């Protein structure tokens, strides 16, 4: 059975260092896809780079936890900014869902305006689209537009509630992160997916060169380690040996 592997680099547009790291991991490594924060400080730079790489799949990284929203969100922002208090609001079930749905549509249009095309797929910064209150909004939005969606099936309460026409990979892994940034970890992810019989798999990553913006992130220097592993010749060989075909969300 042919298996499609999508190695998706999150945070395109966050900074120039992030952008250059993703491009390096695509040109000289195993990254096949990326997702862009349309409110990122380097989003225009990301769009410029992507025009030189037409085969790189570029999706949208829906943002509700960082920077300024595209639309007015008085119910979610503090001093005009988004932040991680969204977790507390989700626990208290006080999320402004109408504002979130509107912001999703506005970020989507912003993506089209900047990149000149629709995104290949949707996911989100800090996985907020997997919140039980937010997931139905994003799932319906993706299904209506015929674009794929990152789904962490371990967190979906009821897979039967997914729209029948919603596209996603059969498997998803966020394990290549933090203390587990090794070639062995990456290949274990592939082996586990193959053991489950999944025909398609997305592996999330965050390769980057460190700049002043990345230094402000709690997840800083591990991005350099990710870049080193993702551009290793032995990892590329290990993927090929396992029969995976590199692809993007346009291949599922």
Curated annotation (Swiss-Prot):
Involved in the degradation of chitin. ChbG is essential for growth on the acetylated chitooligosaccharides chitobiose and chitotriose but is dispensable for growth on cellobiose and chitosan dimer, the deacetylated form of chitobiose. Deacetylation of chitobiose-6-P and chitotriose-6-P is necessary for both the activation of the chb promoter by the regulatory protein ChbR and the hydrolysis of phosphorylated beta-glucosides by the phospho-beta-glucosidase ChbF. Homodimer. GO terms for cellular component: cytoplasm. Its cofactor is Mg(2+). Its EC number is 3.5.1.105. Coiled coil: none annotated. Keywords: Carbohydrate metabolism, Chitin degradation, Cytoplasm, Hydrolase, Magnesium, Metal-binding, Polysaccharide degradation. The gene is chbG. It catalyses: N,N'-diacetylchitobiose + H2O = N-acetyl-beta-D-glucosaminyl-(1->4)-D-glucosamine + acetate; diacetylchitobiose-6'-phosphate + H2O = N'-monoacetylchitobiose-6'-phosphate + acetate. Mg(2+) binds at residues 61, 125. GO terms for molecular function: chitin disaccharide deacetylase activity; deacetylase activity; metal ion binding. NCBIfam families: PRK02134.1. GO terms for biological process: chitin catabolic process; diacetylchitobiose catabolic process; polysaccharide catabolic process. This is Chitooligosaccharide deacetylase. Pathway: Glycan degradation; chitin degradation. Belongs to the YdjC deacetylase family. ChbG subfamily. It comes from Salmonella newport (strain SL254). It comes from the Bacteria. HAMAP family: COD (MF_01246). It is found in: Cytoplasm.
